[in-house]
């Protein structure tokens, strides 16, 4: 049985790349926090954002672009924006 080809989308790939850079930047800022308690608090709050980013990336790598792709990215974006509004970083 032949494997179904993934549907690719260059604009979506750009959004994933931009999201990756945002996650890396925030993680770097969190790791730069000297106070261990505050760093732990920020990290635990940001873990959900990282999880949602990983879900978007993994889904795209495995299945390509499909009907649910934009929804997954929207969930990530909402979580990222919520984190930014609740935590000053």
Residues covered by each model-derived region:
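Acidic, low-complexity, intrinsically disordered interaction modules
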Residues: 36-77
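Long, hydrophobic, amphipathic alpha-helical segments used as structural scaffolds
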Residues: 27, 31-34, 57-64, 84-87
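Short acidic DE-rich linear segments
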Residues: 1-6, 82-89
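Extended rod-forming repeat segments used as scaffolds/tethers
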Residues: 20, 29-31, 44, 48-49, ...
């Amino acid at each position: 049985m032949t494997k179904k080809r993934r549907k690719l989308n260059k604009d979506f790939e750009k959004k994933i790349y931009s999201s990756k850079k945002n996650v890396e930047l925030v993680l770097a800022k969190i790791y730069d926090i000297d106070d261990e308690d505050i760093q732990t608090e920020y990290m635990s709050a940001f873990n959900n954002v990282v999880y949602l980013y990983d879900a978007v990336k993994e889904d795209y790598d495995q299945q390509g672009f499909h009907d649910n792709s934009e929804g997954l990215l929207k969930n990530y974006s909402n979580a990222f924006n919520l984190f930014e509004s609740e935590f000053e970083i």
